[in-house]
Amino acid sequence: MRFDVEAYRKRAKEDFEGAWHQGPEVLTPAGYQHRYPHLQYQRAREHPIFAMINALRQTYLSLGFDECANPVIIEEQDVYRQFGPEAMAVLDRVFYLGGLPRPNVGIARGQLDQINELLGREMTAETEEHLRETLHAYKKSTIDGDDLTHELAVVLETDDARVVHILDSVFPEFRSLCPESSRSTLRSHMTSGWFMTLGSIWERTPLPIKLFSVDRCFRREQAEGPTRLMSYHSASCVIAGEDVTLEDGKAVSEALLSAFGYTDFRFQPDEKRSKYYMPDTQTEVYARHPVHDWVEVATFGMYSPSALAEYGIGVPVMNLGLGVERLAMIHYHADDVRQLTHPQFFPRVLTDRELAAGITLREEPASVEGRHLALAVEAVARAHATEPGPCSFLAWEGTLFGRQVRVSVEEPEENSKLLGPACANEIFVYQGSVLGVPDADKWQTVRTDGVSTGITYLGAAAAMAAARIEEAARCGQGTTVQVKMAKLPSDINLQIREYAMRSITDTKKKIDVRGPVFLTVRSVIPDNL
């Protein structure tokens, strides 16, 4: 909070040591929400796949490759041009694009009568003609499908909801439509786009041409699995020029992959021989990683002159490609590409630190005075914890909401101590379980290896008492707050956030905060006495 600079300057001149010891009084007591580990300063998490994409992009750019966006939609005939006799096998793995046909909607007299009935009025001859023209325009694709409802609403002078009802009731053709496939496909290899791109620019661009693209490809797998996705990212590059050879592929592989921690490299012929590569040029790249040892990370080769000739490309072209997800799996030590790519569908087990941040208090004082009150109750109760009852100790006296309030910690019964033994317990998260434990040898492992929430039973109960005393003072009343035997988190004012509770139950861990607390806090307003 703000403080009087002149007052502290004067105080320091008069009694420096005293002023130094009084320094903490300028601090506003933090609520539990603003205490560690609940208070966190952390950067947002980036997605591992996109982090890898960005790293690959920057590496390619640093190697002098220009970035390119290749076509995603590839016509079937282009696959035949590139793969030759192999095209049929390749097309078995691609997604064809399809769509709903535009129905040829005829409007007979009976249908017009149905529309009139739904509209509650007779259409004019001019409106009927406009209706026919609109449906014909839709058939000819002059009107887009998502605009049809609005256009019909304008013609019929009604609202969109009624038009939807008319289409559903009067024109069943719209409900019985089945998708029809086109001859267009989604790109299954980045190569499909490189032929088209190079065919357009190779004679208009200084050689050698060095391009790269990191983008999405689609492959119709029988099923997705730990190492296969139907939609994946390819990090691909090409070098086109008169003197380009397979040696360029080796050099680019080393330059690109060394940026990701790979050291030694090994190149060996690929048993798969794609027809768009020259014979004996398709090469697998193995690289040694400090953690993973030798791993296959990329493939490169020289495009076949036969395939290049289909696009009028008259210079050799080296192509290198690697799967972004494959590289990310190695980098992030992942064993399932589905979980790496779509973590939201694979609930992550929270760490003890993350669980501790999700445990807070149900009730806390709202005012600064209320926070001071809670700290005072905690301090006085701890100082007199073993005093026998009946007893009462003044903990705090001050103003709340314009009213003078006096607060005491007390034990009204005989043969009982001011506090129960569990008041000193502290909440820890240990191996996914939430435990309230004392400072004793039996629980030393939990206290040493677990994560503290920074919440004690006494502190939580004192905060609840302060919050309720605050509320009572706002209404001009005193109150008595008692916490007895704790069985559930709510008994000691604990709140476990829903995400943390879900993680605890999903992993079959436990919450054990049982213990005798037996704290009584009473507030009075002297003016009411």
Curated annotation (Swiss-Prot):
Reaction(s) the record says it catalyses: tRNA(Cys) + O-phospho-L-serine + ATP = O-phospho-L-seryl-tRNA(Cys) + AMP + diphosphate
GO molecular function annotation: ATP binding; phosphoserine-tRNA(Cys) ligase activity; tRNA binding
Enzyme class: ligase
Residue numbers binding substrate: 189-191, 234-236, 276-277, 319
Any Pfam family hit: tRNA-synt_2d
Transmembrane feature ranges: none
Annotated keywords: Aminoacyl-tRNA synthetase, ATP-binding, Ligase, Nucleotide-binding, Protein biosynthesis
EC number of the protein: 6.1.1.27
Domain of life: Archaea
UniProt record, GO biological process: translation; tRNA aminoacylation
Family from the record: Belongs to the class-II aminoacyl-tRNA synthetase family. O-phosphoseryl-tRNA(Cys) synthetase subfamily.
Summary of the function given for this chain in its UniProt record: Catalyzes the attachment of O-phosphoserine (Sep) to tRNA(Cys).
Subunit structure: Homotetramer. Interacts with SepCysS.
Protein name: O-phosphoserine--tRNA(Cys) ligase
Source organism: Methanosphaerula palustris (strain ATCC BAA-1556 / DSM 19958 / E1-9c)
Gene symbol of the encoding locus: sepS
